[in-house]
Amino acid sequence: MRILQLHCDRIEYSPVKKEIAAAEEPATGGKLEDAVLAFVAVEKGDGPGEAARAAAELRQALGRIGCKKLLIYPYAHLSSTLAAPSIALGLISEMEAALHDLEVSRAPFGWTKSYTISVKGHPLAEGFKVITGDARGTGAPKALESESSMKSTWHVLTPDGNMTDASEFDFAGCPKLKALARYEASKKRGTDEPPPHVALMKRMGIADYEPASDAGNMKFFPNGRLIKSLIERYVTERVVEYGGYEVETPIMYDSNHPSMVSYFNRFPARQYSIDSEGKSLFLRFAACFGQFLMAGDYQLSYKNLPFRLYELTRYSFRREQSGELVGLRRLRAFTMPDCHAFCTDMAQAVREAGVRFELSRDVIGQLGLDAADYEMAIRLTEEFYAENGGAVREMVRRHGRPVLVEMWKERFFYFVLKWEFNYIDGAGKASALSTDQIDVENGKRYGIEFVDENNGRQHPVILHNSPSGAIERVIYTLLEKAAADSARGTKPELPLWLSPVQARIIPVGEELVRNATELAKEMAGHGIRADVDDRNESMGKRIREAEKEWVRYILVVGEKEAASGRLSVRDRRTGKSTEMGLDDLVEAVREQTAGKPSAGLNSPFYLSKRPQVML
């Protein structure tokens, strides 16, 4: 932020012409005598921290001069790296509010203005200041600072409907819920040590950091891309089955679009911003923007509601703090299944939330998480709970375990209810997976309307649901769960339908590679991902490597198996080998992968043809 400060005998200004669409209305001129004029340019990266320090420095300067009149004058010509107008206006307004005890006024923002000034002649009459970020960086946006200072109360709601203050609840028997409560109380999101999944994602050839990109942007190797695509397909199939219309929307939006300004002002420092042909754009952090704008293109009747739009965003972007970025747990670019339901009123929204709650429970379970693997949190206003407490308690009853509740006296966000399933890792860090929100603001903000039973026009209540959470975070959760299993002495594994290789065929000798190949192709015809370890390595080494890659079924093909057509199948779970027919193996795999999408191998058929990933 840059400020040119002038102590003036007289200041007179008048708005002449609008410069931008977001210019303030109404715009009036003014005349002041014996006042300090502060020309202010807000720059990219500025936040409330800079606004607060600028206000403090102006206060000190006026104190030294002995003047109590101040005119804040937006003045773009002091910098070539200006912030988006929506951000600049917000920060200048914050400066004005911080100096409310002075005789402070502000020239209208976004206008070409004529002005006349007469500057006094004393040593302190003129000054220039550059306000930069403090040691913590560029400061958080107002909404985030307000969020961090918000007062809420914490409770635990049990399946029998009892609400207890969290400080008085007996967490014995609920260690993960206790960890979630501690995590929320501490507000510490960083980590001191890399969680176990980081080593696993590299060793398993799933994903790794990309130094050539921004932090929090990952690269996925063939194994990781296969796992990720299968999860994406499954979640999408379930949402479409539920009634979602799958759509696709842009990844970037105009920061100054009328529908975006108030929304974007909530979290400006968390966005990637880019300039294009004079436009200030930001990269979406969810599918909300595109889906809300698209909903406005529809002619909706109450008969069409709930109206459900769905998009799998590849990608959503959020500039999380660098100290919070770790592995697949928290990223700056991520894949998010995002389904919005537009409802007639709160009653319909509450009913729809119940349907989506069950959808999310089932999806997260089918992805490989048991109910005991995650903890539930609910955030809501006192008013919403007073009016809809029965529905909230029913949700907790169906969850079947105590739930952490954060209750606000007043609504700060656009939603009145938000619930989420949180995975608690070995370090006690919580990561939200499935979630839903009841939004009472954005229907009006985006001009979304439907015709009610009386032919009146109404704004819908909107639900924001991700039945799984970010796809990358699902993979993180599965790897962390596998690491925890390993620490307990259980063999780590992925769900069979997500295993990059479900069966590995190991021929005893080179002369049996052809038999192994025919068997693998036959298995592929039944939807089983099978490969052939044709390398000139010992049988023991090849079996050990298959175990290290978490291959569930290991088939050894010798002369006996080639002649009889029977299979010697080693189940990695038990470590035991069993003789069976191909039909038996196919049936076993089908039972474990029923209802899930299938795909072929995403790497060469023969292990001898595969290059090694050096991680």
Curated annotation (Swiss-Prot):
UniProt keyword annotations, A-Z: Aminoacyl-tRNA synthetase, ATP-binding, Cytoplasm, Ligase, Metal-binding, Nucleotide-binding, Protein biosynthesis, RNA-binding, tRNA-binding, Zinc
EC number from the UniProt entry: 6.1.1.3
GO MF annotations, alphabetized: ATP binding; threonine-tRNA ligase activity; tRNA binding; zinc ion binding
Record's cofactor remark: Binds 1 zinc ion per subunit.
Compartment annotation: Cytoplasm
Family per similarity comment: Belongs to the class-II aminoacyl-tRNA synthetase family.
Source organism phylogeny: Archaea, Nitrososphaerota, Candidatus Cenarchaeales, Candidatus Cenarchaeaceae, Candidatus Cenarchaeum
Sites where the protein binds Zn(2+): 288, 340, 464
Gene3D superfamilies: Anticodon-binding domain, Bira Bifunctional Protein, Domain 2, D-tyrosyl-tRNA(Tyr) deacylase
Domain of life: Archaea
Name of this protein: Threonine--tRNA ligase
Protein species of origin: Cenarchaeum symbiosum (strain A)
